[in-house]
UniProtKB/Swiss-Prot annotation:
Signal peptide: none
Species in which this protein is naturally found: Shewanella oneidensis (strain ATCC 700550 / JCM 31522 / CIP 106686 / LMG 19005 / NCIMB 14063 / MR-1)
GO molecular function: ribosomal large subunit binding
Function field: Responsible for the release of ribosomes from messenger RNA at the termination of protein biosynthesis. May increase the efficiency of translation by recycling ribosomes from one round of translation to another.
UniProt subcellular location: Cytoplasm
GO cellular component, one term: cytoplasm
Keywords tagged on the record: Cytoplasm, Protein biosynthesis
Protein name (record): Ribosome-recycling factor
Lineage, uppermost ranks: Bacteria, Pseudomonadati, Pseudomonadota, Gammaproteobacteria, Alteromonadales
Family classification: Belongs to the RRF family.
């Protein structure tokens, strides 16, 4: 029973780390990467559709993304969706392909992004600690039901604390790498 709780807690903490990493990937750095446009929804024949379902997003060079639209009639809708996103991008049309030059980030904008990334990291840490708290409370319920001993609970708390620390360290490493990436000029 305790092993199941421990395994579940580790999986949930891993998911928290992955979710934090995915949230940080959405924060724009000076470099072009296709996941930058993942959150964009396009009005395609009256339905809001993810951009990656109506176009292929690729990297042309370090500061340029290329979006190849599958259906030529959707080029205007894709262009409008990219312009209306809060990313501050300005696509240029070239046939069935849109080229999106990424403007250089100002120092002030970089610092704003670092604040956002730090907030995401803190959210990830809090989620990991919540998983730890839930796991420990589950084991204490088992102790009250006389299904495990007090020593088992103490041992479990120590183990959970160790992998909580390990997962928080992963989040901190992801944060440090993202901060370095953001401050590159």
């Amino acid at each position: 029973m305790i092993a199941d709780i421990k395994k579940d807690a580790q999986e949930r903490m891993g998911k928290c780390v992955d979710a934090t990493k995915n949230q940080m990937a959405k924060v724009r750095t000076g470099r072009a990467h296709p996941s930058l446009l993942d959150s964009i929804q396009v009005s395609y024949y009256g339905t809001m559709t993810p951009l990656n379902q109506v176009a292929n997003v690729g990297v042309e060079d370090a500061r340029t993304l290329s979006v190849t639209v599958f259906d030529r009639s959707a080029i205007q809708a894709v262009e409008k969706a990219i312009m209306s996103s809060d990313l501050g991008l300005n696509p240029m049309s070239a046939g069935a392909t849109l080229r999106i030059p990424l403007p250089a980030l100002t120092e002030e904008r970089r610092k704003d992004f670092i604040k956002v990334v730090r907030a995401e990291a803190e959210g990830g840490r809090v989620a990991i600690r919540n998983v730890r708290r839930d796991a420990i409370s589950d084991v204490k319920k088992l102790e009250k039901a006389k299904e495990c001993t007090e020593d088992d609970v103490r041992r479990f708390e120590d183990e959970v604390q160790k992998f909580t620390d390990a997962h928080i360290k992963k989040v901190d490493e992801i944060l440090a790498a993202k901060e370095i990436e953001l401050m590159e000029v």
